[in-house]
Amino acid sequence: MTIHIYNTLTRQKEEFIPLEENKVKMYVCGPTVYNYIHIGNARPPMVFDTVRRYLEYKGYDVQYVSNFTDVDDKLIKAANELGEDVPTIADRFVEAYFEDVTALGCKHATVHPRVTENMDIIIEFIQELVNKGYAYESEGDVYFRTKEFEGYGKLSHQPIADLRHGARIEVGEKKQDPLDFALWKAAKEGEIFWESPWGQGRPGWHIECSAMARKYLGDTIDIHAGGQDLAFPHHENEIAQSEALTGKTFARYWMHNGYININNEKMSKSLGNFILVHDIIKQYDPQLIRFFMLSVHYRHPINFSEELLRSTNNGLERIKTAYGNLKHRMESSTDLTDHDEKWLADLKKFQTAFEEAMNDDFNTANAITELYNVANHANQYLLEEHTSTVVIQAYVKQLETLFDILGLELAQEELLDEEIEALIQKRIEARKNRDFALSDQIRDDLKDRNIILEDTAQGTRWKRG
C-alpha cells in the first residue's frame, strides 16, 4: 500500500515518493516564541508529529526539522512592554513550548534550530540573492525582487498581477514593488541587531526558514508543512527565495492543516476567544486534546468546544476500558483453538483498514474509527466462553501499536483488589449513615473504572467488567 499526500502546490493527492529511498526530509514551521501557544498554534505540531510517526512506522528514516523564530517584531514589542531583553523572553517561551507540546504527545524534532543561532547562514543566503540580482539593498534594508522570480504565486495559485493589485507599500518601506518583501531589516534605535554587509539589523521572517531548511535538509526537501495561514505569503516567499538561489525545487510536497474555531466562531485574539494550551491541559487530559484534534482530518477546520471534548472523552474511555479488560484477562485464558483463528483474521482486517486510512493523506479521522472497531471487537471476544492468551495478546499489541502511531498512550491505572475493598467498605459506612449520595458516587466511580458491584443478602460482591 502506497502513501498519497494532498499537495497544496498541485491541489491534488499524489503518491508519496521521497527523493532518497527510505529517507524523508521534512520541515515544519515552528512558533515565534513571544508568548504561550494557543490551541491553534498546537494543531500543526500534533498533526505533523503524527505524520512523522506514521512514516517512521512504515520504515522511513525521518529527518524532522522545526524552527524557533526567536527574534522579530513581536518579540521586540514584548521585550519593550515587559522591560526584558529579547533572548530572555525567547528562552522562557521556548521552554514553555516544549512543556506544552510534550504534554500533547509530540516528540522533539531531529533539530530545533533557532534564528539567532543561524545568523551567519541567513546573511550568506541573502548576499547570494543580492549577487544573483534577486535582491537589492535600500537604505539598510534588503528586499527580494519578486518580479525576477517567474514562478511567484504558484503555491497560492494566484496570478502575480492579482497579488500585486492587493499589495501595498507600508509607511517607511523603501521597496521598488508592492510585492517585494524584506530579507533584512535595518535596526531601529534601541533594537537588537546583528552586523551585516548592509549595516546593523536583523532578518525578515521568510528568509530564516529558507536558510535553515537548506542548512539542515539540503536544497530540496520532501515535505514542507505548516498551518493554512502560512501558505501565503510565508511559504510562497520561501519558494521564491530558495528556488531563486538554487534553481532547484524547494519542496516536493506541501501540506497545510486547517483552522480551529471556538464554539463555531473563528478563533482570534481580537475576539478574545483563543485558548492557551497551558491553561486547557490543566482542565483536560492532554491525551484527550490530542485524540480530539486527530478525530478530524487535518485539512478540515475543527470546532473546539468543551461539549465536544466531553463527548470525545467518552469514546476514548471506551477504548481504554477495552484495553484494561484485555490486560486483566491476559493470564486467565486458554490455548489457541481453531475458532480463535477467525478473530485473528478479523483483527488483521482492522489493521489493514487503519493503514489504508493513514495512507490516504493521513486520514486520522477514519483511522480512529478502526480503533473503535478493534475495541468493540475485543469486548465481543471477551464474552466468548473460551478465550486465548494468544488472541488477547494480539488485541493488546494492536491497540498499543495503533495508539503509538497517533502519539497516544493507553496506560490506565488499574485499581488493586485492596483499593476496591477499601472503597466498598467506605460505601458500606456511607449507607449505614444514610449518606446515599456518597454511596452512589462510589458505586458510579467504580463502574467508570470497570468494577461492577452487586449488593446481596450476604453483602456486596464485586467483579471486573
UniProtKB/Swiss-Prot annotation:
Binding-site list for Zn(2+): C29, C209, H234, E238
Chemical reaction(s) catalysed: tRNA(Cys) + L-cysteine + ATP = L-cysteinyl-tRNA(Cys) + AMP + diphosphate
One annotated GO molecular function: cysteine-tRNA ligase activity
CDD domains noted in UniProt: CysRS_core
KW Nucleotide-binding (keyword) present: yes
GO cellular component, one term: cytosol
Residue spans crossing the bilayer: none
Requisite cofactors: Zn(2+)
Keyword vocabulary terms for this entry: Aminoacyl-tRNA synthetase, ATP-binding, Cytoplasm, Ligase, Metal-binding, Nucleotide-binding, Phosphoprotein, Protein biosynthesis, Zinc
Residue ranges of the motif 'KMSKS' region: 266-270
InterPro entries xref list: Cys-tRNA-ligase (IPR015803), Cys-tRNA-synt_Ia_DALR (IPR015273), Cys-tRNA/MSH_ligase (IPR024909), Rossmann-like_a/b/a_fold (IPR014729), tRNA-synt_1_cat_dom (IPR032678), tRNAsynth_Ia_anticodon-bd (IPR009080)
Top-level class of the enzyme under EC nomenclature: ligase
Family of this protein: Belongs to the class-I aminoacyl-tRNA synthetase family.
Protein name, per record: Cysteine--tRNA ligase
Annotated source species: Bacillus cereus (strain AH187)
Organismal lineage: Bacteria, Bacillati, Bacillota, Bacilli, Bacillales
